[in-house]
């Protein structure tokens, strides 16, 4: 059945919503009309009923298992995309509003937007701002300028648009007394992480953890007790925690899909095995690009190249060839490789569901395109 489906499914390298594992789609299809024999679709069950209570609790349990999340943390499932938390986090953590300072590490479009949105709720200090360098690299942490009185520090672990991924050691370079907030939207569940190094992690699900419309939050319980009480319910972290994210109707189907994906990751051997595959895919593609005699070029500092989002140009920005590349790739069932409108060029997203074989199909196409367009 899976093989037959793969005959008509394209190689989707889109940045998000990203590719979903075929096994997950088939499981959702199988249960769509009659979830666990209850006579209703998962989309129809009450969020307060026993069926969905089982779904949300199992999803939380499996996420804790995969990331070794201790009982010092709670997991929230919030409606909407991760960018909603660019407002939601300072609303919860800045009790004095715009008088409170928040440190932002600006390494790409999403951390830039977080700092821009943050100014409505706090005083923004840009610890480092890499826009002058066109978001091609990140300066060494020793040069970062933190505020002594900052409420928290915010950074984006993987910049989807610019193809920048921060090193695993980044939290070790942040002041120990600062609350550490990390946007992991586009590399969440792509590798093991030490959750204990963070106070709050958040991620939109539509890359590696599900479908669009839900944001996952991992937050220290001690931090929950410090949140402002006068925050609207939809953003009130403490209220969400106290009600198991069920104080109003959550995106039930989205949580269900996240649950299926977590089971898929567990069946694949967990995050260590997933990381090995992601390293292999990224290495193969970057190595090919770097050895193409500059026909393809990735200008991102090699120390910060994203495993998830590979951005590159053809002949230093030959837009005519890039459009031709996209058009011809589509004929070979290779889709969603156009760069973000703000930067142009090409972008290949190698999320968990993308296989090594699919990556090699892309590289083979790139080789043929190069040979035919020298």
UniProtKB/Swiss-Prot annotation:
L-glutamate binds at residue 48. It holds the Pfam family Aminotran_5. The modification N6-(pyridoxal phosphate)lysine is found at residue 207. Its cofactor is pyridoxal 5'-phosphate. Pathway: Amino-acid biosynthesis; L-serine biosynthesis; L-serine from 3-phospho-D-glycerate: step 2/3; Cofactor biosynthesis; pyridoxine 5'-phosphate biosynthesis; pyridoxine 5'-phosphate from D-erythrose 4-phosphate: step 3/5. Binds 1 pyridoxal phosphate per subunit. Its EC number is 2.6.1.52. It is an enzyme of class 2 (transferase). It comes from the Eukaryota. The keyword Nucleus does not apply. GO terms for cellular component: cytoplasm. It catalyses: O-phospho-L-serine + 2-oxoglutarate = 3-phosphooxypyruvate + L-glutamate; 4-(phosphooxy)-L-threonine + 2-oxoglutarate = (R)-3-hydroxy-2-oxo-4-phosphooxybutanoate + L-glutamate. GO terms for molecular function: O-phospho-L-serine:2-oxoglutarate aminotransferase activity; pyridoxal phosphate binding. Keywords: Amino-acid biosynthesis, Aminotransferase, Pyridoxal phosphate, Serine biosynthesis, Transferase. Belongs to the class-V pyridoxal-phosphate-dependent aminotransferase family. SerC subfamily. Homodimer. Catalyzes the reversible conversion of 3-phosphohydroxypyruvate to phosphoserine and of 3-hydroxy-2-oxo-4-phosphonooxybutanoate to phosphohydroxythreonine. This is Probable phosphoserine aminotransferase. It comes from Dictyostelium discoideum (Social amoeba).
